[in-house]
Curated annotation (Swiss-Prot):
The lineage of its organism: Bacteria, Pseudomonadati, Pseudomonadota, Betaproteobacteria, Burkholderiales. One of its GO terms (biological process) is regulation of DNA-templated transcription. It comes from Ralstonia nicotianae (strain ATCC BAA-1114 / GMI1000) (Ralstonia solanacearum). This is Bifunctional protein PyrR. It comes from the Bacteria. Its EC number is 2.4.2.9. The gene is pyrR.
Length: 174
């Protein structure tokens, strides 16, 4: 890894290994995957393929973030799409980077707008450890400390089974 890049593919493979261990012995139909727009949605789509899960959903947190407009994000980016019943389902919630916990809190609120899951487990490629809320991931690619003025940007090349991820460290924008 260079100082500017983090091996997102290696982190993804670590996440897959953890999830395969966790899901061993349970029917794939017991799980539904929901990824947070946009990096989490990319990861969720690939996890669904790699773990043999039937479907995955996309969660848009815009309506539940108190600082969305302040960060320059737009609510209309991509709507929440959950092609499964949330009620009494075991949901694997996926995001690329966990920092303050605010996005995860917003995603859980969005999921509960669709029903009451039996359980929600959280998987992230990177945990920055900058929590402002008591949120903890169940599955982590790696914990990585970044400077306060840095952010990680996930990019996806290709789609489906040929998709590959890369992370780049970039200066944080406002």
């Amino acid at each position: 890894m260079t100082s500017q890049q983090i091996d997102a593919e290696a982190l993804y493979q670590s996440l897959v290994a953890q999830l395969r261990t966790r899901m061993a012995g349970t029917p794939a139909g017991d799980w539904s995957v929901a990824g947070i727009v946009s990096g989490g949605a990319w990861i969720a789509a690939r996890l669904a393929l790699d773990l043999g899960l039937r479907e995955y959903g996309i969660v848009n947190v815009a309506l539940h973030r108190d600082d969305y407009a302040k960060k320059g994000l737009h609510a209309q980016a991509q709507p929440t799409t959950l092609p499964f019943e949330v009620e009494e389902r075991r949901i694997l919630l996926v995001d690329d980077v966990l920092a303050t916990g605010r996005t995860i809190r917003a995603a859980i609120n969005e999921l509960f707008d669709y029903g009451r899951p039996a359980a929600v487990e959280l998987a992230v490629l990177v945990d920055r450890g900058e929590r402002q809320l008591p949120i903890a991931p169940d599955y982590i690619g790696e914990r990585i400390a970044l400077a306060a003025d840095e952010s990680l940007v996930l990019r996806q090349e290709g789609e489906g089974a040929s998709a590959r991820f890369t992370f780049t460290r970039e200066p944080k924008t406002a």
